[in-house]
Structures are given as structure tokens and as C-alpha cells.
């Protein structure tokens, strides 16, 4: 593994005072742990037709999507007062392909087909995942808010203040396509193109639409992943209960998400609270200059205009 990594193009992020390094492997940038997970999954992961992937670019609503999916598939065992989400961080409830291959394989052996989360580009997914007709849920978000959220997440991980980490430099790197799991537009475009060929196995969810009116999206998600709500459940308000349980306000207020650690056994563990910054859209307006806005709008039109996805 180390021999492969040594040969790859690399970039140390200037806005993070060179404390974070990305490696380019097959046209996508990743930090070392995700890169190792990608290579390992290419070699060892075998998809099952019952697998469901929850795919996203980082900071696009991943935590929320994982919480919703987990609450949906476990609602027969737990309600909103007994759910493991009350004591367990969402990222620890659903395995990540980049990091939890052994757990995923164990689940498959035991016929426990829980969703599998991933930040991989579509073409970076193991071949079996792309050829076995697994269902794929893809959540996407306004690119401007993604940049702001990504910036804060990384600078807090490496323990830099806003003053120490220039946002302008983060913005410029992102626009060059240099970001974790970037380029961002290639990430979205890859899943979108694949959905044109196999629309029946893809569900696209827009973060902003979900925030505005979550119930229809949650119902659509449950139908798609094979756990539809019954008319009786809908009448009883089960969907609304799940929406409340998985809301930013609820999850961010839980002790586990205020003081716990994600993957505490690892050298690069992350504070759970860093996954819960604001949970709203439009925060980019507090950071972007008019020039930045014009630049990013032009970039979105050039790179993603053909998709028809609204990312501004």
C-alpha cells in the first residue's frame, strides 16, 4: 500500500498550514486513510444485490441521510424514545465503505443488508457495486454551502482558528478541484451520468428540498430502500417522529454528539460535535464576496449545467 501511495501526485493544503495532505489516485483526490480504503475495497469488496449505498460528497448532508436511513430500517425494533441514535453517533450506526470493509463483509455473511455509506466517486466504487444493480441513494447540496462546511470541518480537525486558516485559499483550492473526494463536480457528474443509464437503481435527494419539506423525502427514501411506511404508520405520525428524531436540533443536542469521539480507537479520531456545525442552508452568504459568487456560479454552469441539478 505504501509503495502505491508514494508514487501518487500529492497536495498539502495551504489554508490548513500544510497539516492535511491529499493524494490523487485515478482522477480523484483523497486523504491517505480513504485512499487506502479505496484500494482495499477494489481488491476485496463483493457487492450483494440487496446492498444499498448512501453516496455523497463530504459535507452534503451525509450525517443526516445516515440517521434517517437507520431510523427507517430499525423502526420496527425501536421508536423515537429507544433508538440507538439517542446514544450512538449516526456515522457509527451505518458502515462506511472506505473504513469499515470488515464490518460490511460480516453483515453480508449474516444477511444483514444495512445500507453502506460512501464518499467514493461512482467510477471509484468497486466493480461489483457498479454491475450488480445495487440501489444507490445520492444526496447533493448547494456547492457554496458545501465549500463553507468543508472549510470549517477541516480547519477544526487540524485545530486552526478562522484567522489562521484563510477561507480564500480554501475557496481557490476547491475551485481547482483539489479537495477531499474532489473534484466536486466530477463526483456529482459521475453519479448523474450513471443514473441516466440505470434510473431505476438511483434516488437523488436535494439537501435544500429535504430541509424545506422533509416528510415527502423521507417517505420516498423509505420506499426506495425497501422499507415503505404503511398507511397505519403514516396516520400515526411515524414519519414525522423520524424527522424529529433525526433533525439537526435533536441530534446536535444529544450528549454523545456534543462530547463523544468518532472512531476513538484510531490515531486520527474526530470529535462528534464537528459533524454538527449549523445544519442549515445559505450560510455561504456570510463568507462569499461578490467575485467569489460570480466565479462559483460560472463554474457550476460550465461543469454541471447539463445535469439540470440546481446547485446554486
UniProtKB/Swiss-Prot annotation:
Enzyme Commission designation: 2.8.2.25
UniProt keyword Nucleotide-binding present: no
Field pH dependence: Optimum pH is 6.0-8.5.
The keyword Transferase appears for this protein: yes
Residues forming the catalytic site: 119
Gene Ontology molecular function, alphabetical: flavonol 3-sulfotransferase activity
Subunit: Monomer.
PANTHER family named in the record: SULFOTRANSFERASE SULT
Protein's recorded name: Flavonol 3-sulfotransferase
Organism classification: Eukaryota, Viridiplantae, Streptophyta, Embryophyta, Tracheophyta
Amino acid at each position: 500500500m505504501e509503495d502505491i501511495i508514494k508514487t501518487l501526485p500529492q497536495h498539502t493544503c495551504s489554508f490548513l498550514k500544510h497539516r492535511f495532505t491529499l493524494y490523487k489516485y485515478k482522477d480523484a483526490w483523497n486523504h491517505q486513510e480513504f485512499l487506502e480504503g479505496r484500494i482495499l475495497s477494489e481488491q476485496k469488496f463483493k457487492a450483494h444485490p440487496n446492498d444499498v449505498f448512501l453516496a455523497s460528497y463530504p459535507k452534503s448532508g451525509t450525517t443526516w441521510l445516515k440517521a434517517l436511513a437507520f431510523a427507517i430500517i430499525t423502526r420496527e425494533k425501536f421508536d423515537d424514545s429507544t433508538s440507538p441514535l439517542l446514544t450512538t453517533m449516526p456515522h457509527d450506526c451505518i458502515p462506511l465503505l472506505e473504513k469499515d470493509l470488515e464490518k460490511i463483509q460480516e453483515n453480508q455473511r449474516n444477511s444483514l443488508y444495512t445500507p453502506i455509506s460512501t464518499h467514493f466517486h461512482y467510477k471509484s466504487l468497486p466493480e461489483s457495486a457498479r454491475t450488480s444493480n445495487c440501489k444507490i441513494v445520492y444526496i447533493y447540496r448547494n456547492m457554496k454551502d458545501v465549500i463553507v462546511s468543508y472549510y470549517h470541518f477541516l480547519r477544526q480537525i487540524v485545530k486552526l482558528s478562522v484567522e489562521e486558516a484563510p477561507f480564500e485559499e480554501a475557496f481557490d483550492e476547491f475551485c481547482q478541484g483539489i479537495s477531499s473526494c474532489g473534484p466536486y463536480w466530477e463526483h456529482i457528474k459521475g453519479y448523474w451520468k450513471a443514473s441516466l443509464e440505470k434510473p431505476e437503481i438511483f434516488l437523488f435527494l436535494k439537501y435544500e428540498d429535504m430541509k424545506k419539506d422533509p416528510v415527502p423525502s423521507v417517505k420516498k427514501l423509505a420506499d426506495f430502500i425497501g422499507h415503505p411506511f404503511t398507511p397505519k404508520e403514516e396516520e400515526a405520525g411515524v414519519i414525522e417522529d423520524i424527522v424529529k428524531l433525526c433533525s439537526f436540533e435533536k441530534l446536535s443536542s444529544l450528549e454523545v454528539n456534543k462530547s463523544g469521539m468518532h472512531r476513538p480507537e484510531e490515531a486520527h479520531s474526530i470529535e462528534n460535535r464537528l459533524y454538527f456545525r449549523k445544519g442549515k442552508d445559505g450560510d455561504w452568504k456570510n463568507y462569499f464576496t461578490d467575485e467569489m459568487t460570480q466565479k462559483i456560479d460560472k463554474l457550476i454552469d460550465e461543469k454541471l449545467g447539463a445535469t439540470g441539478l440546481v446547485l446554486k
